[in-house]
Every structure is written in structure tokens, then in C-alpha cells.
Amino acid sequence: MDDIIRVEISQRQPILRIMNQFDQDFYVDAHGLKIPLSENFTARVLAANGYIDEPFAGKVDTLHTAIAAEVFKTADFIRNDSLWSAQIAQIYVDQNHEIELIPRVGNQRIILGNADSLDAKFHNLYLFYKKALPQAGWGTYKSINIKYANQVVGVRNQSTKQDSIMAARAKADSVKAVPDTALTIKNDTSQIKQ
């Protein structure tokens, strides 16, 4: 024995923080392994919560449920794209195990469905952001559904509908409220020099 101990250390890089439905928090690293939270450091990573039934035993472990694997796949896709990494703040899993994304800009929910065809879904969302939102406005939609192939379904906010109806009525009322005297020409000749 040569009295030499060799130690290899590799640091895990968390890319996702999951808060499961059992009120357990844990990170998932870049390799898809669950790791416990640190008492000394909080990683600034994408958060996922909702109906995620992935158990956590407090130690490094693999992902066991299909929904956790889909959430990881989605988070990995988002972190590798600078636009979506800046735009998406949170992943939420609803009771039907459908993935929703919460953006940093805008109040709408982005319904992703599952983690299939992420390139196509995010490309469709990009086109919607580029073409529809500049015309309609960022607060127009309460949800943007990108889970279907080759289509984006936007559901308008009820308040936006009411605002546009009220704006149309206000415009019509303002046209009616213009007094007739503003449109008539006065025939006052007292100031004309002869």
C-alpha cells in the first residue's frame, strides 16, 4: 500500500427545481438526476410545480415518472435556447399531466401539452410572438395553446374583449357628442373692412 488516496470530485449542475405534489423540493441536474437542495446556496434555475408525482428520498437518484422526464426534457430545451431561457420563468403541470409554461413577459399561460416536438412547438410560439402579439398586444390573450401540430390557439382575455367593446362604444359616442356648432360656419361680417 502506498498511502495515497485519490479522490475524484465532479460538481453537479442543477438546471431545474421541482416542487412535487408531496411538498418536497429537489433539483434535477443536467444529466437528469435528482439532487437535494443546498442549505448554503440557491441555484437560479427554472422552477416546476403542480401535479408532479415524482417521489424524492433525499439522495441522488434517477427520475422515475414519465411526467418528471417530460418536465426535465422541457427544461433542458428551454435552458439551451437564449430566447426561451430569458422568457420562460416557470413550468406548471396541471391535473391532467399537461405542461404549461409561465412567461416572464405577458400574463398568459402557454399550454405545451407534452414534451414531444419541442422544436416545432417553440418555433410556432416564436412566430406567434413575432407576428400576432405586436398587433394584438401582450395583454390580449389569457392562454396560448401550442400543443397541436402546426397551429397556435390563442384564447383572449375577457377583460380585453370588454375593453375593445367599450373602446368602440366610446368612439361612437364621441362622434355623436360633437356639437353641430363646431361644424357650422359663422357668417359674422362685423370684422370685415370695406
Enumerate the language-model features and the residues they cover.
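Charged, solvent-exposed interaction patches on well-folded alpha/beta domains
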Residues: 2-194
